[in-house]
């Protein structure tokens, strides 16, 4: 059990540190942006930007760790035993058929959303069937997905930092309802981005940086997915993570009270961009006086 807990806690620590470092570098870069380089901050405002900013990033990393946590909690042989295995397979097959042949919320969204949802569910159902009927495939599947999810985490952190930089250059703030609007008008936004930025070189750069960071930080962890089998470590890590996540949610919300000063840039720099995106999505409004 100790080896499993060491693996999980080590992953959380590395992802959190990477998130905080990325946030620190981003804040320093944004401070030298043309919109903020001439501003003078008081000592208290510097503390808000960097100390509260690091705390907000840690909270966001804790919440974001939930996707990897769910995957690790799902690594088990129990789901391949009768009758659970056939129940799960039936649910996945039914979900695939429903999304593929019926009118669903994905059809309301339009674009390629229905095809993407159908493809994901079909892939999930098909691969679960392979794991169910071919036992030797299970360990390989878990190892590959474990490594892939960790790589995606690193890529998401790098991609988000670069995206926030360009968004700040355009609007002088963290993500807001304009960023949410980008998701609605995806085709138009993608077209504008392709015309305005060197997307291919940037994408290749993000991929290279992601792979280098993943290999440097996680190369000893990527092949350890078999440690995740078992329930004892989950009985300890599960409640601990839920408590940490709830605390992180509360702290992120609590810290917003420090983001209402007269200096808009201090408010924005100390905030976490992903939480600002979530907040804008929930509130569904834009501060027109600010813009």
Regions found by a protein language model. Name each.
Residues 289-291:
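Basic, amphipathic N-terminal segments that precede the first structured/catalytic domain
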Residues 3-287:
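Transmembrane and membrane-interface helices of multi-pass
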């Amino acid at each position: 059990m100790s080896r499993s807990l060491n693996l999980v806690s080590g992953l959380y620590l590395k992802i959190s540190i990477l998130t905080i470092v990325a946030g620190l570098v981003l804040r320093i870069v944004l401070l030298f942006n043309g919109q903020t380089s001439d501003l003078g901050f008081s000592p208290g405002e510097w503390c808000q930007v960097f100390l509260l900013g690091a705390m907000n990033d840690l909270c966001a990393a804790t919440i974001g760790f939930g996707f990897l946590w769910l995957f690790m909690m799902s690594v088990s042989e129990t789901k391949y035993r009768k009758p659970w295995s056939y129940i799960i397979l039936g649910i996945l097959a039914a979900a695939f058929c429903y999304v593929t042949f019926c009118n669903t919320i994905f059809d309301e969204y339009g674009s390629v959303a229905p095809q993407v949802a159908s493809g994901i569910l079909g892939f999930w159902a098909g691969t679960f069937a392979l794991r169910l009927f071919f036992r030797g495939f299970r360990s390989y599947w878990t190892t590959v997905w474990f490594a892939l999810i960790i790589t995606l985490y690193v890529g998401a952190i790098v991609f988000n930092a670069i995206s926030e930089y360009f968004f700040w250059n355009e609007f002088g703030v963290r993500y807001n309802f304009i960023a949410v609007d980008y998701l609605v008008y995806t085709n138009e936004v993608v077209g504008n981005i392709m015309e305005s930025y060197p997307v291919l070189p940037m994408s290749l750069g993000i991929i290279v940086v992601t792979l280098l960071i993943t290999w440097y930080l996680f190369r000893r962890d990527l092949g350890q997915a078999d440690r995740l089998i078992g329930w004892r470590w989950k009985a300890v890590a599960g409640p601990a993570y839920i408590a940490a996540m709830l605390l992180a949610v509360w702290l992120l919300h609590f810290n917003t009270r420090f983001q209402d000063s007269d200096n808009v840039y201090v408010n924005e720099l100390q905030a976490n961009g992903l939480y600002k995106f979530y907040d804008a999505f929930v509130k569904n409004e834009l501060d027109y006086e600010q813009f």
